[in-house]
Amino acid sequence: MNFQPLGKRVLVERVEETKTTASGIIIPDNAKEKPLSGEVKAVGAEAEGVKVGEKVVFAKYAGTEVNLDDKTYLVLNIDDILGVIK
């Protein structure tokens, strides 16, 4: 993938959550909410505080979805990232 976010933007790949509950109930894709966390794949030159490979949590309605290499990513403004999961 050749994508470089500009300015204070970050490219994030959503982390998929489990599709089965603890009791074994399978949750269909259309009933699941989109995850609010993901892995940073690329960082713009002015985006500070996150690095490629880190797991981050972001605001619910943040970002713009883009399709690259048959995968869906989010381009987020650095201000929409709420924190880093360590």
Curated annotation (Swiss-Prot):
Its main location: cytoplasm. GO terms for biological process: chaperone cofactor-dependent protein refolding. GO terms for cellular component: cytoplasm. Keywords: Chaperone, Cytoplasm. It comes from the Bacteria. Gene3D superfamilies: GroES chaperonin. GO terms for molecular function: ATP binding; metal ion binding; protein folding chaperone; protein-folding chaperone binding; unfolded protein binding. Belongs to the GroES chaperonin family. Together with the chaperonin GroEL, plays an essential role in assisting protein folding. The GroEL-GroES system forms a nano-cage that allows encapsulation of the non-native substrate proteins and provides a physical environment optimized to promote and accelerate protein folding. GroES binds to the apical surface of the GroEL ring, thereby capping the opening of the GroEL channel. This is Co-chaperonin GroES. It comes from Campylobacter concisus (strain 13826). The gene is groES.
